[in-house]
């Protein structure tokens, strides 16, 4: 089952200019885990917003940066819904802008 977590607009950590990340995230999980993800959506969204604001444009540029963020999101979600887990995290939108 794929569960959308919605749109995110996050101020990135930049010293000189305001930069934002606009992204949409969905997660894939077993059908039996879907209700746990939905029940914890506010906590999951808060965690994603808080730790992603520490990223810089440079750290998110390129495939490796996006994969690192995706892996970190999956780890954080799985910590929140433990002992359940999500199998995959999908970016359905990923835009860095001013």
Predicted regions span which residues?
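Flexible, low-complexity charged segments
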Residues: 1-98
């Amino acid at each position: 089952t794929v569960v959308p977590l919605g749109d995110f607009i996050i101020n990135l950590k930049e010293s000189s200019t305001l930069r934002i990340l606009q992204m949409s995230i969905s997660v894939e999980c077993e059908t039996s885990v879907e209700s746990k993800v939905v029940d914890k959506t506010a906590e999951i969204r808060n965690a994603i917003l808080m730790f992603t604001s520490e990223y810089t444009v440079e750290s998110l540029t390129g495939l490796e940066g996006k994969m690192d963020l995706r892996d970190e999101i999956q780890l954080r979600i799985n910590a929140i819904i433990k002992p359940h887990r999500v199998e995959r995290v999908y970016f359905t939108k990923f835009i860095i802008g001013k």
